[in-house]
Amino acid sequence: MRFLLAAALAASTIASPLTAQAAPPDLSTSMPLPGRWSWTPTVDGSEATYFDTAGRAQLWLHCLRGARTVTIARPASGAAPFLMVWSSSASRNLLASFNPATAHLTAQLTAADPLLDALAFSRGRIGAGISGTAPLVAPAWPEIARVVEDCRA
């Protein structure tokens, strides 16, 4: 019985190359990019946007209420397979797509995804990263939770 339990635990910790995740940065020591969050109602839901001090949008969470999905996006210079998203309690590499017209890397989650709760209730900071670039760390403000709740209503 102990052998089966040990074998099961060992097998569960082996990650395939498709699911391997880079370790997220330590949010407790990462300084957030100076800026501010803004919440805006949209025709199809709502959106929270994080602007740097120059007024450039750096991170978006957009609710499509009819589809019950939340799209997370950040500027990117090219395509990447994953958008790494993390909070103080959870992290995940999300399959991403690149839109060359807007130069954004986007990932989509269902409104019920627990990662959205982790972002909404993160202790102080959240992050979004693209392999080969510096991670974007932003403060966790109420605008994030508002978008999540709008999508679940």
Positions of the model-derived regions?
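Positively charged n-region of N-terminal signal peptides that target proteins for export
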Residues: 1-4
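Bacterial N-terminal signal peptides
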Residues: 6-16
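Sterically constrained small-residue positions within well-ordered secondary structures
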Residues: 11-13, 52, 63, 98, ...
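N-terminal secretory signal peptides
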Residues: 20-81
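Internal interaction segment
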Residues: 21-22, 91-153
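Short polybasic amphipathic segments
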Residues: 48-49, 82-84, 125-128
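A short, polar/proline- and glycine-enriched secondary-structure boundary/capping micro-motif
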Residues: 60, 82-83, 140, 148
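Extended low-complexity, serine/threonine- and proline-enriched intrinsically disordered segments
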Residues: 80-92
